[in-house]
């Protein structure tokens, strides 16, 4: 009997409910869900695009860092000899001075000719060393003075030579790999007499 009463009560409730109201509620819930899904899909797409952009930026930065690192390594290797060569330059200068002294004095004694041969041999080895490691000697005369590779030590006033020419090289200069000045050449520069 109780069971019957419950069934009757349920039927009454169903009859009293308006199906349009129930349907509207369902439609509204569906609309909210659809809107939420669309919103979440848009956010997901935007997030994916941002992630892709950031990945591209990170990849570019990694390539830049890699290239910069490789350039630094190349530069370090290329110019690793710089300090050693700079310290070695006074020794080279002294060998050249000794060679020039013996040649200018023109000593004919056997011991001096033997020293001269050995000094010339050392100079030839140094030239090969310079060539091997791309070191250029700056010792040209009758060229225009270039302040980036020459240091003027004196001025020679004359009308025989064009002004601003290298007349004499007092001390050779050196360039490493055509770009790094190890030491400027100490030179005498010509200037017109007034």
UniProtKB/Swiss-Prot annotation:
Keywords: Chaperone, Cytoplasm, Stress response. InterPro entries: GrpE (IPR000740), GrpE_coiled_coil (IPR013805), GrpE_head (IPR009012). Coiled coil: none annotated. It comes from the Bacteria. CDD domains: GrpE. GO terms for cellular component: cytoplasm. GO terms for biological process: protein folding. Participates actively in the response to hyperosmotic and heat shock by preventing the aggregation of stress-denatured proteins, in association with DnaK and GrpE. It is the nucleotide exchange factor for DnaK and may function as a thermosensor. Unfolded proteins bind initially to DnaJ; upon interaction with the DnaJ-bound protein, DnaK hydrolyzes its bound ATP, resulting in the formation of a stable complex. GrpE releases ADP from DnaK; ATP binding to DnaK triggers the release of the substrate protein, thus completing the reaction cycle. Homodimer. This is Protein GrpE 1. The gene is grpE1.
């Amino acid at each position: 009997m109780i069971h019957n009463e419950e069934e009757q009560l349920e039927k009454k409730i169903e009859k009293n409910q308006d199906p349009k109201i129930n349907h509207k509620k369902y439609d509204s819930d569906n609309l909210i869900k659809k809107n939420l899904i669309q919103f979440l899909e848009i956010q997901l797409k935007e997030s994916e695009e941002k992630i892709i952009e950031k990945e591209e930026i990170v990849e570019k930065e990694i390539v830049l860092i890699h290239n910069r690192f490789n350039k630094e390594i190349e530069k370090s290797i290329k110019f690793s000899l710089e300090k050693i060569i700079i310290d070695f330059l006074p020794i080279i200068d002294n060998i050249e001075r000794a060679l020039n002294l013996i040649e200018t004095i023109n000593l004919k004694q056997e011991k001096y000719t033997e020293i001269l041969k050995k000094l010339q041999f050392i100079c030839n080895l140094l030239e090969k060393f310079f060539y091997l490691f791309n070191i250029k000697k700056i010792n040209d005369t009758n060229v225009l003075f270039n302040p980036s590779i020459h240091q003027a030590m004196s001025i020679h006033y004359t009308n025989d030579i064009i002004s601003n020419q290298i007349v004499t090289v007092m001390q050779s200069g050196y360039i490493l790999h055509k770009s790094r000045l190890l030491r400027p050449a100490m030179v005498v520069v010509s200037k017109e007499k007034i």
